[in-house]
From Swiss-Prot:
Similarity remark: Belongs to the Mulikevirus tape measure protein family.
Primary location group: host cell
PANTHER family with a match to the protein in the record: MU-LIKE PROPHAGE FLUMU PROTEIN GP42
UniProt-recorded name of the protein: Probable tape measure protein
Protein induction: Expressed in the late phase of the viral replicative cycle. Expression of late genes is activated by the viral late transcription activator C.
Pfam families in alphabetical order: TMP_3
Biological process according to GO: viral tail assembly
């Protein structure tokens, strides 16, 4: 296809009367439109009706679902509460009784007696029934009798209350003492380990026997402290801490433990009054049904039925997925063909992103650069305009003269315009008629929209009543106008005449004030933005006072700069130097740099508080004055005047190269902006993956 030119011809053959056929076609289109409108109107009514029915059904379904959900949640809550408060407690107690019976080898009398003692001990101590029963089983396992077990547990509970043990710590000390009891010997290792729990075995034996501690330690080292010494230690420890647990029961933890034990007994009584047995009977029925169904094969049939339903569901999902893929595959293939033969979708997406990025960057860059461009272009545009004015004046081009010493009366009479008075001016027209007109408030009084001017008409006119409602009228066509030397260039927009008509000093002052106002607005906006961002960040929250001072400088200075044409303090600092004709450009620039440095230094120093503001302003002023030469050009730009800043020309280029071969394929995309220095190239070397 490369190098060939393709041509396609489209031929429209109109047979018969074109106008008649056009009317027929128009009538058919109108009929089709009316029919379509009727059909769509009817369809809309049906859609609205069906939508209303769906809404009603949805409301009913939602209400029903809420009722079912509330009922299900209620049932679940009742079941959970019953299981947690009653059934679970009864099941745990049942398990404890079974364990106790097993411990006594089926002797239910001894088991019940020990269970009764454990219940009472749990009410009188902070261990709880589970802790007491665990300790009973452990003590019996180490070979203690029932009486020794009771005395040992009581001694251990009193020692725990005296030393402030919790249940795990008490169980650790208990294990070490029971190992010593089972070994029937007190070793040095036992004594050292028990010291960590606050129990001095050697000292307890020395106090009980009246023997020196060193002698007891030597006996322990030699392994001569047997069962008699162990029982003496237990008895001594019990006497040392006797009653400590009873005193602990008067504390908050003790009363709470006692209340918990009483509540547990109440829950077990409620469960054992009938509900627990009923639930157990229902569970037995379920288990019996399971056994019968398993034996008869019914359980296997039920499992097969459920498995087949799951299998059918899985197959349906698979078929649906395959059918969906069958419909999606053509679209996928079409996109793949486009990606391979016409344009890479990845490259196309990158091109779109690059174009969007270039657009945003150009807009953002112009928004930032426009104020700087206006300031920078002022001296050049002013010089160019003055040069054009001088050139036109030398060439003697014709134009409307503006004499330096000529009154408006003389000027207007010279071109054939004289003053007349009108008394029948329309009412309400710009406040010239008696009806007045819309006025604009200015300086505390209402000013008319149009200024009062003499009504001037060309040619000799008789005077009317002396009620001046003056406006300006030009002479009629045909009246000759004398050509005069070229005047100063008149502006295309209002407002520039007042500046150009003044002296060079007036132009300098006006431009300086205007540029200070623009700079004030920009500086105020920047400070305000910095203050707002710092106030919302983590640093802003830490240095709240500094951020507040920065925000004050931004907002307050912004308002003052925009309304007064520059900061008051800045104007007071700059005025003596800028208005001094003998001051050099470098000195003026130094004054500007000193003021700007004071502003910025004070803003940064405000992060450290009021003293930081003063110090920062002072240092910034000194640094800015030394950098005055750097801002010389900035001062010269501020002194220029222009109401019409020339819009910056931005040269942007967007190119798309298409290579024709076996198919159409996008090879590159380039966006270049010469004015702002922005170059975005969508090629292999700039964007990864191209």
């Amino acid at each position: 296809m490369t190098g060939k030119r393709l041509k396609a011809s489209v031929i429209i053959d109109l047979n018969g009367n074109l106008s008649r056929r056009s009317r027929q076609y128009s009538n058919q289109i109108n009929a089709l439109s009316r029919s379509g409108q009727s059909s769509l109107r009817a369809l809309r009514m049906e859609v609205v009706r069906v939508s209303g029915a769906i809404d009603r059904m949805g409301s009913l379904s939602t209400r029903t679902f809420r009722m079912l959900s509330a009922g299900a949640l209620g049932i679940a809550g009742v079941g959970y509460t019953a299981n947690k408060l009653f059934i679970g407690a009864a099941a745990q107690r049942e398990q404890q009784i079974i364990a106790m019976n097993s411990l006594y080898h089926g002797d239910k009398v001894r088991a019940q007696a020990m269970m009764a003692w454990a219940k009472q001990n749990a009410k009188d101590t902070t261990w709880g029934l589970s802790g007491v029963l665990d300790e009973i089983r452990s003590s019996k396992g180490f070979g203690m009798t029932d009486e020794q077990t009771k005395q040992f547990i009581t001694m251990l509970q009193d020692q725990g209350a005296m030393h402030g043990w919790d249940l795990p710590t008490a169980q650790g000390a208990s294990l070490q003492l029971k190992q010593m009891f089972a070994r029937q010997q007190i070793t040095a290792a036992d004594a050292n380990l028990l010291t960590g729990y606050g129990i001095n075995v050697y000292q307890a034996l020395a106090d009980a026997t009246g023997t020196d501690v060193k002698k007891i330690r030597d006996l322990g080292t030699k392994g001569k402290l047997g069962m008699k010494s162990i029982l003496t230690v237990f008895r001594t420890l019990s006497e040392q801490s006797k009653g400590a647990q009873a005193s602990a029961m008067n504390s908050w933890d003790g009363m709470f433990a006692q209340m918990e034990a009483n509540l547990l007994e109440f829950r077990i009584k409620v469960a054992n009054s009938g509900p627990f047995e009923e639930i157990k009977n229902e569970m037995r029925r379920v288990l019996n049904w399971h056994d019968m169904a398993d034996k008869s094969g019914e359980l296997d049939a039920l499992a097969e039925n459920i498995g087949q339903k799951f299998l059918t569901t899985f197959r349906t999902v698979k078929i649906s997925a395959q059918e969906l893929w069958r419909w999606l595959k053509p679209g996928k293939d079409a996109l793949a063909w486009v990606d391979q033969n016409i344009v890479s979708l990845k490259k196309l997406a990158a091109v779109l992103v690059s174009v969007w990025l270039a657009n945003k960057a150009l807009r953002a860059g112009w928004a930032v650069a426009k104020p700087s461009w206006q300031v920078a272009s002022y001296p050049f545009k002013t010089g160019r305009r003055m040069w054009r004015w001088m050139r036109n004046r030398k060439r003697g081009q014709a134009g409307l003269p503006v004499p330096d010493a000529m009154t408006s009366e003389t000027l207007l009479q010279g071109i054939g315009i004289q003053r007349v008075f009108v008394i029948n001016w329309p009412r309400g027209f710009g406040d010239y008629g008696s009806g007045g007109g819309r006025r604009v408030r200015s300086g505390g009084r209402m000013a008319p929209l149009l200024p009062r001017q003499p009504l001037l008409l060309s040619g000799p006119q008789p005077l009317a009543l002396p009620a001046p409602r003056p406006v300006l009228a030009l002479p009629p066509p045909g009246v000759p106008v004398t050509a005069r030397p070229a005047p100063l260039p008149l502006p295309g927009k209002s407002g520039l005449l007042s500046r150009l008509a003044g002296s060079a000093a007036g132009q300098l002052v006006t431009g300086t004030v205007g540029k200070l106002a623009d700079a004030g607005r920009a500086v105020g906006g920047w400070f305000s933005g910095i203050g707002n961002k710092l106030a919302g960040s983590a640093i802003g929250r830490v240095v709240t006072k500094g951020a507040g001072a920065l925000g004050w400088m931004g907002k307050g200075a912004g308002r003052a700069l925009s309304r007064l044409g520059g900061p008051v303090m800045g104007a007071l600092q700059l005025a003596p130097v800028l208005m001094d004709e003998q001051a050099s450009t470098h000195e003026k620039a130094g004054a500007i740099g000193s003021t700007a440095g004071a502003w910025l230094g004070g803003a940064v120093g405000s992060l450290a508080g009021p003293l930081g503001t003063v110090a920062g302003a002072t240092l910034g002023s000194v640094a800015g004055e030394y950098l005055g030469g750097f801002v010389t050009d900035l001062y010269q730009k501020w002194t220029a005047t222009d109401k019409e800043p020339q819009e910056q020309k931005v040269n942007a280029e967007a190119s798309l190269r298409v290579e024709l071969g076996e198919g159409l394929r996008l090879t590159s995309s380039r966006v270049t902006e010469d004015g702002m220095g922005l170059n975005i190239y969508a090629g292999d070397n700039y964007i990864t993956g191209w």
